[in-house]
Amino acid sequence: MGSLDKDNQDICPICLDPLKEAVSTDCRHLFCRMCLTQHMDKASVSGILSCPVCRKPCSEGVLGDNYICHTHQKRVRRFCEASGHLLCEECLQSPEHQSHTELSIENAISHYKERLNRRSRKLRKDLGNLQQLKAQEKKMLQALQVDCECHRLRTDLQNQDQTKEQLKALPWHWLDQEDLPEEVAKIFSFSEAVTQLSILVSGLERMAKDLDASTLKDASDLLDRSAPQKLEGLLSRVSPAGPKLS
């Protein structure tokens, strides 16, 4: 029986699915944060907020500090895309936000989660292309190393006053040793870009997975940010659309 009770504690009584962002009411019942938020939205029409299970009174504060407007001490209901702020009903009446576009918290989370996932898929494809370019540069470096050995052989022949016919027998397209550092630098640039892009993609995927009202502004800021300049140059070689994150 104890095991059954434990299993029930991991299920939201409203959606009957495993708890997501679990929050506890004043009476200690657990719900998905979004499920309880939607319940409170409906209950606020009547002005009576109560636990969906036992009907005991509960406050909006159980949703957490991030869901309460610190200016008016009321629950936030909308996300302003222009300012990146969470707004309560009183905030929405402010002239500051009259010309702004606001989304409901639920729609904003869904909207930004889709944008984050779409961008991470695009950048993961770019990451694969960068890794291919890095592999190509490595092959070129190996070829240059062989060429340098041949270059040294050519120099030895010159030092030994060999005939022009012997020199002409060697390919003249071989590069000098001074070209090697440039190729090594290219490989380091690609390695650095692959590392940066891997971290960026992982961050986008993690943010999309854990996105909630408290991180909507972070998601908006991240999507509006451009890649570092060095990364932009390398991404432009694999992505004609450009490296902006949004």
Curated annotation (Swiss-Prot):
Its EC number is 2.3.2.27. It comes from the Eukaryota. A zinc finger (B box-type) spans 64-105. Interacts with NEDD8. A zinc finger (RING-type) spans 12-55. PROSITE patterns: ZF_BBOX, ZF_RING_1, ZF_RING_2. It comes from Mus musculus (Mouse). This is E3 ubiquitin ligase TRIM40. Disruption phenotype: TRIM40 deficiency greatly enhances antiviral immune responses and interferon-beta production and thus inhibits viral replication. Keywords: Coiled coil, Metal-binding, Transferase, Ubl conjugation pathway, Zinc, Zinc-finger. The keyword Metal-binding applies. GO terms for biological process: negative regulation of cell growth; negative regulation of protein catabolic process; negative regulation of protein localization to nucleus; protein neddylation.
